[in-house]
């Protein structure tokens, strides 16, 4: 991310604030290959200002460093954030910039304890660029954090509380609170089939976010179908995070003796592993089954999706009642573990790779999620 500190900032700002901002922007931990930010300053325009001369007394190699940075910047295509007194969508005063750039980027999840494993797998396998994983580097330095919203329905409440800390700053600068948010909300869709409009509960969540003046444009089309063209909100295109687990995970589970001796688990896995329709794998409710949902009248789409199972329907409809393994390899009971806490751990396994994640993904969504996160950094 490029940050341009403009001429009027050098001419009109308090040096203490300018110096503090410069240290935030230019700081690079010794363990990192790259700094968090790139800084663009046209030294020809600012080098005669009092503030620049003062900054040089603290940073003896300032001019050489900034000229090298600026040469990279002018030959690139990145649109910078600006630190300036002029108004603009990506323009901030020094006071605003200190708050905005010093905060970590947030990935808001329904449950960060469980769901983070999925996102970390996406970052690990899709974020590597010539041996450098920028997103992982930001996590390692505390510049990118996972936030726990406390459930899907609670996301608007979480965001309202999160944004409250910007209230005074926003009022002082006549801005929306959301202008200071650096992050993305990632939400399960709970969709039951491919072209299902967003569920009323999710529409309510979006409406509440809109009521907080959070931009929800591009999440849905006019028919309430997912388009996911919003930079700060991503609703998963499959049913839930577990639907992105590669088949290799379930193949590994069924190899275990304790599973092979449990007829219910073995039967469910045998049927699941023989499903060939991607839409079935994308939208099956893995833990609960209940293939036709809770509709008073079963939608045609669900009849089409699951009506070809024959005698396998009843077994698959029971759901995958798997709660994890004990250290001795035996199965945990529902009192000892839970599907939601155990299954995300499988994203960490060595046999989960970019290739089998892409195969299960099928349309490049995981790369798009990674790209959305990366643009925030």
Please report, for each region that a protein language model flagged, where it lies by residue.
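RecA-like P-loop NTPase motor core
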Residues: 62-191
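N-terminal extension/subdomain marker
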Residues: 1-89
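Activity-critical C-terminal alpha-helical subdomain
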Residues: 194-330
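Charge-biased C-terminal accessory regions appended to nucleic-acid-, cytoskeletal NTPase
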Residues: 7, 32, 39-50, 299-377
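Short, extreme N-terminal segment that most often corresponds to the first beta-strand
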Residues: 1-15, 186-188, 234-240, 376
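Short runs of predominantly hydrophobic/aromatic residues within well-ordered alpha helices
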Residues: 105, 115, 241-242, 366
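Generic structural signal for hydrophobic core residues of well-folded globular domains
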Residues: 122, 248-249, 253, 350, ...
């Amino acid at each position: 991310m490029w940050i341009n500190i403009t001429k009027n900032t050098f001419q009109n700002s308090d040096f203490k604030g300018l110096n503090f901002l410069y240290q935030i922007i230019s700081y690079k931990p010794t363990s990192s290959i790259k700094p968090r930010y790139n800084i663009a300053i046209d030294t020809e325009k600012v080098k005669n200002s009092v503030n620049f001369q003062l900054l040089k007394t603290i940073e003896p190699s300032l001019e050489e460093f900034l000229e090298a940075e600026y040469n990279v910047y002018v030959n690139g295509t990145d649109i910078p954030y600006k630190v300036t007194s002029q108004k603009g969508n990506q323009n901030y005063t020094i006071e605003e910039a200190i708050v905005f750039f010093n905060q970590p980027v947030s990935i808001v999840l329904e449950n960060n304890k469980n769901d983070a494993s999925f996102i970390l797998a996406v970052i690990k396998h899709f974020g590597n660029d010539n041996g450098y994983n920028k997103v992982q580097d930001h996590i390692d330095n505390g510049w990118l954090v996972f936030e726990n919203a406390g459930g899907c329905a609670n996301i608007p409440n979480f965001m309202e509380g999160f944004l409250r800390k910007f209230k005074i700053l926003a009022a002082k600068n006549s801005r929306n609170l959301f202008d200071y948010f650096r992050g993305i909300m990632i939400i399960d869709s709970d969709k039951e089939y491919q072209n299902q409009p967003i569920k009323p509960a999710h529409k309510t969540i979006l409406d509440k976010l809109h009521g907080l003046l959070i931009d929800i444009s591009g999440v849905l089309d006019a028919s309430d179908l997912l388009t996911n063209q919003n930079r700060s909100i991503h609703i998963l295109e499959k049913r839930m995070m577990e639907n992105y687990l590669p088949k290799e995970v379930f193949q590994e589970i069924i190899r275990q003796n304790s599973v092979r001796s449990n007829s219910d688990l073995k039967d469910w896995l045998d049927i699941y592993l023989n499903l060939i329709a991607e839409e079935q794998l994308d939208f099956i409710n893995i833990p609960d089954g209940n293939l036709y949902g809770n509709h008073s009248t079963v939608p045609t789409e669900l009849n089409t999706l699951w009506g070809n199972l024959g005698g396998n329907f009843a077994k698959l409809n029971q759901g995958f009642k798997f709660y994890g393994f004990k250290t001795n390899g035996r199965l945990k009971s529902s009192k000892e573990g839970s599907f939601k806490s155990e299954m995300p751990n499988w994203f960490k396994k060595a046999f989960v790779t970019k290739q089998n994640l892409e195969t299960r993904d099928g349309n490049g969504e995981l790369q798009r999620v990674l790209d959305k996160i990366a643009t925030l950094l």
